[in-house]
């Protein structure tokens, strides 16, 4: 077998008949499969052992040779080679066809490659191939020209003969008529008898004339056809063709079927054709030029690749190895077989019949029919259903052809090459493990034993518990007591990977150190649930075991859960306390007035109360019951750092551990602060979720990950402990209905009645009534909500849960205890009848019914959203999978400008709300200079929070930062342009697959995005705004938006004219150029609100001034227009901004750089307008880097560079346009991609990730890139002594090449444990 690590590219091309014969080990001559009595393959059949190899290892068909010692011998009796049976997976056969057939991919695909090559319309091509028309393959012009006059004279003679014959016949008939009439007259017949005779005579003469004329016309047609006869001409009339063949057979050749196509291709001069097409393109116009361009693409492909177009017509058909189209016996003695065998059988049957007919010398019409059937059967084998009705099997099911095996989710690419199954894995239900540390998981004993079986067996032998591997295996299977001790030892510090489907981002797989637990459920740390999106309502997770030392090291260093606290999308911590933990910490840090033992100032009667010399003393008081955790106290602290402002007052040289200070706080807050790192300033406030998030963010920014991990673990423990102690529970009694509710409802009911009366009187129309009612009831709902909030006591558990940020919100509380309010109908409009009841009181039947609309739509939406969002992620991954950090710095000077703050009216700086996702974690492209010219931060510095604060303090509002949009790396991007990795908080590593991270970061929140298209605030007739997921798809697919808004092509003054339904906008340019007119703009779309020159805002009106690229109407701008008018940089900014708007509306934080990575891929290509002296074809798409390199080369040689314009491609198109044919074929439209790749003889350089996964190489990202792969690990003596590996008794296991990823894999299938006796 070929080792995948030793080749660098993979090429696909057209196979000629000779290639097919070279691959083959013999010809399949019979349609038989296996003998149903002996169950052995039939000789020369589809499973023949002589062709494909033996069915049993080292055993020939007749049984003469058995055993491995005869290896390589070919049996003289049955002709079978003695070898392994697995050669039946790789040996191919072939079928020699009695007549050539065309390959359906090249004839039927769109566009038809054969048609373009031969310049034949697909319809004509079909007629030729399926024997409905003859085609002229060659004409001997010279001979025809030389003998034309002779032939013409012969034709004239023939015509003369026909005319003479006609005249003679007419003469004779006329004389006979005269004689008959004379005779009748003599007999004295009546006049009507005479008339009848005359009429019949004249009729016969007319027929004679017509017959002669037809003959003359036919001769004319034959002659005209012959004189104009040219190659590739179709002749549908069989009689005409026969005549031509009989008369002028030596001057031309013609045929039908694939043979004629083959002859045409043989006579085809590719170079001459390419030259003439280039000439047409240079001089032609319109349709003619377009057609020539399309044809040139195909012709040039053959010219440049050196492929022979003969490969599109087959003389032999390959037969794939039998193990890939198996036949298996079912229980009932029946057989199940792959559809391919049926399809091959049809081909062989028809082929054999055709051979027989040709040998018998059957009439041409019968032979042609058989040839047509053969062509159809080969078509069905290659791509069933592409032409005509598909061939069906039992139960009218279309048979799966070779193309179907590659296509779609169940095809070879997606099912078997990109989604392989893994050994050393298990799955089970998950339960919570609150006692675990962040980097641990609980692994059921039985599962661990099965997973670590080889390790345990090896260790049992090492420790002399077992004599050999076989007995060790028996011990493990019988679960002897020693096994458990060995298992404990083996799993120590051996991380396992846990994965929960769907794995939407990279945190869906993390490494943990296993702890053995009883039971059969995997225990999961509560803080990693957020990353896995797991809950414990029956979710299952899979466990995988990293085997090699390198895999274990990667799992521990890169994938351990405590190293993955930050989200790769936004850089915010994901391992946050949630639900009960939040409630517990909130309870712990609450301050309650009047609680037991609270601080009281000294009076003349009593000293100070509630003052403690240390936290320990306060805890003693609490244990004694004299102090509540939530009471305000004064306490002297020495081990906790004071808040920053207090520290500046109290300690001039800064606080050191041991310095005492007094805090006015609660014991709970002191306990909370003891959980944080020593040097973290004291936090003296109530901890709701937002504050907790802020603290953990801060910790992640300032402390190493290990400290953060330990801290969140402590917070988790404290959270659970105090949540239990707080006794927060919810019962019916806690759901309190506010007493004002009745009065509020009655008041609004009266208003609604008034509106209803107006409507009845006709003072309001239907729409106005509905809008007024909706407004009234929205106010009522809001008022009930406010009343509810004021009515609830502070210690109510429901309010505590909501206010702490653990879960839920006030709207849900209002629904429970206030009123549900207005609901929508399936169209998304409000139903003007509100739901007045709360869930506590219960709904009436009508209320329940109208509530179900929204509820059911919600469920349906969720299901649709999940599928859509998954598909979006898949397309994003596909388009960005080859964006990998390839170098440290591309040294570009370019960058993009980002805003840090806006100046307010009073001159103060207002920090930009989106700094976190725009400037944060990037690298400065130029020095940041303040108003006086001082350099605040130098170029190349990373922008973290401290740096941004420094810039704002210096009054700098915008900075220029490096971005992937301006990166000049030839492949992938450079680390400096990408900036900081959001997941680690450090500069991104070389080898990081930032493209995939970007796709996951955008795709993972996709499910949260809403499906619906929003109505603009109740304005009827207002255009729908497309929002949510559809909008994101529209942007990434670069589609023209519905209701697109025109943008100003030039800067100038607006002239506005309106008619009944339309606006007409004319822009008079400032530079005095031609006026630009936008006609027929629908009034329904409404004009854009703009800021006028005097600073006021208003609708665009006559005389306003607009800049280039300003939108003129409401709606979304078309990105292609933005590209045309404003250029690539603006369209990049536009797309990033628009995508971010959708995500921000849902409260999802994603860093701009992820969206930029995708947008960069959408703008990578250039359309060639003029090819200059380059090889590019006009109208073709090419990579920008390739375009620039080629232009540089041509200019250096003194040629004319090509002209091109940037083009914006949607992600699906961009994925299919990738250089890698493997990646494109595994994405969509597999057959089309492969057809194209084969004609162009495409070579896949294996740069991206997908290509390498498909052929089984390590991916060129992460530790798979060459700079990491060629590291050699030299273990120390201790490591050598302590390490245990998969059973292997060779001491050279730790030879110097230990750790080389390119070493041969262990063939586990061939391991017989019996060798170790």
UniProtKB/Swiss-Prot annotation:
One of its GO terms (cellular component) is DNA-directed RNA polymerase complex. It holds the Pfam family RNA_pol_Rpb1_2. Its EC number is 2.7.7.6. It catalyses: RNA(n) + a ribonucleoside 5'-triphosphate = RNA(n+1) + diphosphate. Binds 1 Mg(2+) ion per subunit. The keyword Metal-binding applies. GO terms for molecular function: DNA binding; DNA-directed RNA polymerase activity; magnesium ion binding; zinc ion binding. One of its GO terms (biological process) is DNA-templated transcription. Its cofactor is Mg(2+); Zn(2+). Zn(2+) 1 binds at residues 60, 62, 75, 78. It comes from the Bacteria. Keywords: DNA-directed RNA polymerase, Magnesium, Metal-binding, Nucleotidyltransferase, Transcription, Transferase, Zinc. Zn(2+) 2 binds at residues 890, 967, 974, 977. Mg(2+) binds at residues 535, 537, 539. It is an enzyme of class 2 (transferase). HAMAP family: RNApol_bact_RpoC (MF_01322). The RNAP catalytic core consists of 2 alpha, 1 beta, 1 beta' and 1 omega subunit. When a sigma factor is associated with the core the holoenzyme is formed, which can initiate transcription. Belongs to the RNA polymerase beta' chain family. DNA-dependent RNA polymerase catalyzes the transcription of DNA into RNA using the four ribonucleoside triphosphates as substrates. This is DNA-directed RNA polymerase subunit beta'. It comes from Mycolicibacterium smegmatis (strain ATCC 700084 / mc(2)155) (Mycobacterium smegmatis). The lineage of its organism: Bacteria, Bacillati, Actinomycetota, Actinomycetes, Mycobacteriales.
């Amino acid at each position: 077998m070929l080792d995948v690590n030793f080749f660098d590219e993979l090429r696909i091309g057209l196979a000629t008949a000779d290639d097919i014969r070279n691959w083959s080990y013999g010809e399949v001559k019979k349609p038989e499969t296996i003998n149903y009595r002996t169950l052995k393959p039939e000789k020369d059949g589809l499973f023949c052992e002589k062709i494909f190899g033996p069915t049993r290892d080292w055993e020939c068909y007749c049984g003469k040779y058995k055993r491995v010692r005869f290896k390589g011998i070919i049996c003289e009796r049955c002709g079978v080679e003695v070898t392994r049976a697995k050669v039946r997976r790789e040996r191919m056969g072939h079928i020699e066809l009695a007549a050539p057939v065309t390959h359906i991919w090249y004839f039927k695909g769109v566009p038809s490659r054969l048609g373009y090559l031969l310049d034949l319309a697909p319809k004509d091509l079909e007629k030729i191939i399926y024997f409905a028309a003859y085609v002229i393959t060659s004409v001997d012009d010279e001979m025809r020209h030389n003998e034309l006059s002779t032939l013409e004279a012969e034709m004239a003679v023939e015509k003369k003969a026909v005319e003479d014959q006609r005249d003679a016949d007419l003469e004779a008939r006329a004389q006979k008529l005269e004689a008959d009439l004379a005779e009748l007259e003599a007999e004295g017949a009546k006049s009507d008898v005479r008339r009848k005779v005359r009429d019949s005579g004249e009729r016969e003469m007319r027929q004679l004339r017509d017959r002669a004329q037809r003959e003359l016309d036919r001769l004319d047609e034959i002659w005209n056809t012959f004189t104009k006869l040219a190659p590739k001409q179709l002749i549908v009339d069989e009689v005409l063709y026969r005549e031509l063949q009989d008369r002028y057979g030596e001057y031309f050749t013609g045929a039908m079927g694939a043979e004629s196509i083959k002859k045409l291709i043989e006579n085809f001069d590719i170079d001459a054709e390419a030259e003439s097409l280039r000439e047409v393109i240079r001089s032609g116009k319109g349709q003619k030029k377009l057609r020539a361009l399309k044809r040139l693409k195909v012709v040039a492909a053959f010219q440049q690749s050196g492929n022979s177009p003969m490969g599109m017509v087959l003389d032999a058909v390959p037969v794939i190895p039998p193990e890939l189209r198996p036949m298996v016996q079912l229980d009932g003695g029946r057989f199940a077989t792959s559809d391919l065998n049926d399809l091959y059988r049809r081909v062989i049957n028809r082929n054999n019949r055709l051979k027989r007919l040709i040998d018998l010398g059957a009439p041409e019409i019968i032979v042609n029919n058989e040839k047509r059937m053969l062509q159809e059967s080969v078509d069905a084998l290659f791509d069933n259903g592409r032409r005509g009705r598909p061939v069906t099997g039992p139960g009218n099911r279309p048979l799966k052809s070779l193309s179907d095996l590659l296509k779609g989710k169940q095809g070879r690419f997606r099912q078997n090459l990109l989604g392989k199954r893994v050994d050393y894995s298990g799955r089970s239900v998950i339960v919570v493990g609150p006692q675990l540390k962040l980097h641990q998981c609980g692994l059921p004993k039985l599962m661990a034993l099965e997973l670590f079986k080889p390790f345990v067996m090896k260790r049992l032998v090492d420790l002399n518990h077992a004599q050999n591997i076989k007995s060790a295996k028996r011990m493990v299977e019988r679960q002897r007591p020693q096994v458990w001790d060995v298992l404990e030892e083996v799993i120590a510090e051996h991380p396992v990977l846990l994965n929960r489907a769907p794995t939407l981002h990279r945190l869906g797989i993390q490494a943990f150190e296993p702890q053995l637990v009883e039971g059969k459920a995997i225990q999961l740390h509560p803080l990693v649930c957020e990353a896995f999106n797991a809950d414990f309502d029956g979710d299952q997770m899979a466990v995988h075991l990293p085997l090699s030392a390198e895999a274990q090291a990667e799992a521990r260093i890169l994938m351990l859960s405590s190293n993955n606290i930050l989200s790769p999308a936004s850089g915010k911590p994901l391992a946050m306390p949630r639900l009960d933990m939040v409630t517990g910490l909130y309870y712990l840090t609450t301050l309650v007035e009047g609680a037991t033992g609270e601080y009281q100032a000294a009076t003349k009667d009593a000293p100070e109360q509630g003052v403690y010399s240390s936290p320990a003393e306060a805890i003693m008081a609490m244990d004694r019951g004299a102090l509540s955790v939530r009471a305000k106290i004064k306490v002297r602290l020495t081990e906790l750092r004071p808040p920053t402002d207090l520290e500046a007052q109290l300690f001039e040289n800064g606080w050191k551990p041991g310095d005492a200070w007094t805090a006015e706080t609660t014991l709970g807050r002191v306990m909370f602060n003891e959980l944080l790192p020593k040097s973290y300033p004291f936090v003296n406030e109530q901890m709701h979720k937002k504050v907790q998030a802020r603290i953990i963010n801060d910790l992640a920014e300032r402390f190493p990950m290990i400290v953060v991990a330990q801290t969140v673990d402590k917070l988790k423990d404290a959270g659970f402990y105090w949540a239990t102690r707080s006794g927060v529970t919810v019962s019916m009694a806690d759901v309190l209905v506010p007493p004002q509710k009745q009065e509020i409802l009655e008041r609004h009911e009266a208003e609604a009645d008034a509106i209803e009366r107006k409507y009845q009187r006709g003072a309001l129309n239907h729409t106005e009534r509905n809008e007024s009612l909706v407004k009234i009831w929205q106010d009522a709902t809001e008022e009930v909500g406010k009343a509810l909030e004021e009515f609830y006591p502070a210690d109510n558990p429901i309010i505590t849960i909501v206010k702490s940020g653990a879960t839920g919100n006030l709207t849900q509380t209002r629904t429970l205890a206030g009123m549900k309010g207005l609901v929508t109908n399936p169209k998304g409009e409000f139903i003007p009848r509100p739901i007045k009841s709360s869930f506590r009181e219960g709904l009436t039947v009508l209320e329940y019914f109208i509530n179900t609309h929204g509820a059911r739509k919600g469920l349906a939406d969720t299901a649709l959203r999940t599928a859509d969002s998954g598909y979006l992620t898949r397309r994003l991954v596909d388009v960005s999978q080859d964006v990998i950090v390839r170098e440290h710095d591309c040294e570009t000077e370019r960058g993009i400008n980002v805003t840090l703050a806006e100046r307010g009216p009073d001159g103060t700086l207002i920090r930009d709300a989106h700094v976190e996702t725009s400037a944060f974690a990037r690298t400065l492209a130029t020095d940041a200079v303040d108003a006086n010219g001082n350099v605040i931060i130098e170029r190349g510095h990373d922008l973290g929070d401290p740096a941004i604060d420094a810039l704002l303090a210096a009054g700098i509002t915008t900075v220029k930062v490096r971005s992937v949009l301006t990166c000049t790396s030839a492949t992938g991007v450079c680390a400096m342009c990408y900036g900081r990795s959001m997941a680690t908080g450090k500069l991104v590593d070389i080898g990081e697959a930032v493209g995939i991270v970007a796709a996951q970061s955008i795709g993972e929140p996709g499910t949260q995005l809403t499906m619906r298209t929003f109505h603009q605030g109740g304005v009827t007739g207002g255009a729908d705004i497309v929002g949510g997921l559809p909008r994101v798809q529209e942007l990434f697919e670069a589609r023209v938006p519905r209701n697109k808004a025109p943008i100003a092509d030039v800067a100038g003054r607006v002239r506005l004219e309106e008619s009944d339904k339309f606006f007409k906008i004319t822009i008079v340019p400032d530079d005095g150029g031609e006026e630009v007119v936008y006609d027929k703009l629908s009034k329904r779309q409404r004009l854009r609100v703009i800021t006028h020159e005097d600073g006021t805002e208003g609708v665009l009106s006559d005389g306003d001034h607009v800049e280039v690229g300003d939108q003129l109407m409401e709606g979304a701008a078309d990105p292609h227009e933005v590209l045309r008018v404003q250029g690539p940089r603006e369209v990049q900014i536009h797309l990033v901004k628009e995508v971010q708007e959708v995500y921000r509306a849902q409260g999802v934080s994603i860093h701009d750089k992820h969206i930029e990575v995708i947008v960069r891929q959408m703008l990578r290509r250039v359309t060639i307008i003029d090819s200059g002296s380059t090889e590019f074809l006009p109208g073709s798409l090419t990579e920008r880097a390739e375009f620039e390199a080629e232009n540089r080369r041509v200019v250096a040689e003194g040629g004319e560079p090509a002209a091109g314009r940037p083009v914006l491609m949607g992600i699906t198109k961009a994925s299919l346009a990738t250089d890698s044919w493997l990646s494109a074929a595994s994405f969509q439209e597999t057959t089309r991609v492969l057809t194209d790749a084969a004609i162009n003889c495409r070579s896949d350089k294996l740069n991206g990730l997908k290509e390498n996964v498909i052929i089984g190489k390590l991916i060129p990202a992460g530790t798979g890139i060459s700079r990491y792969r060629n590291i050699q690990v030299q273990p120390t003596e201790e490591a050598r002594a302590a390490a245990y590996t998969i059973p292997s008794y060779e001491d050279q296991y730790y030879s110097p090449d230990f750790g080389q990823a390119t070493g041969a894999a262990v063939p586990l299938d061939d391991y017989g444990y019996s060798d170790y006796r």
